[in-house]
Amino acid sequence: YKGNVGSGDKARIFVCLTNMTKPGCTYHTVNTKSSEIDKTVLDPTQEFLYTNLNDPSTLEGHIIGYGDLLIEQSQSSWKQVDIQIHYRDKYASEKPNVLILTASASYRGDYFEGSTDSNLYLDDIEFIYE
């Protein structure tokens, strides 16, 4: 990656390996334009994914593992990083059926808490697994 981290801001890259168990569900939507944002937010540290966190009947699936990288300093030249995936032991035998990758130049920009000077570029993303 490379990019500029504006004043008071951070960039973020995270990845979730998920098992979507709701029939036909192949993605997770976060509605950043809604006043209900906290009900749809994707938090990789949480075990389950819901369309609405306040409604258990909206369960979409569970997170098998996740990795997270917060970037707090600007990087003018390309930098290679490895993001380790932290797996939940109880799902060790499962294979994920959906990969969620999120990259944001301003990781709290959806809350208007960032900098308009931030930018983030990604290149040559590679997943290595056994």
Show the residue positions of the predicted features.
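Predominantly extracellular/luminal cell-surface or secreted proteins
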Residues: 16-20, 128
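Short coil-to-beta strand junction motifs in C2/discoidin
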Residues: 7-14, 120
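Cysteine-clustered segments with highest specificity for TGF-beta superfamily mature ligands
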Residues: 97-101
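One-face residue pattern on beta-strands with alternating periodicity enriched for small/polar residues
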Residues: 2, 12-16, 80-86, 102, ...
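Extended, low-complexity, turn-rich repeat/linker tracts enriched in Gly/Pro/Ser/Thr and Asp/Glu
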Residues: 2-9, 21-24
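Extended extracellular/luminal ectodomain segments enriched in beta-structured repeat modules
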Residues: 8-10, 93-96
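Extracellular carbohydrate recognition
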Residues: 75-77, 91-95, 105-129
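Extracellular carbohydrate recognition and processing domains
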Residues: 24-95, 115
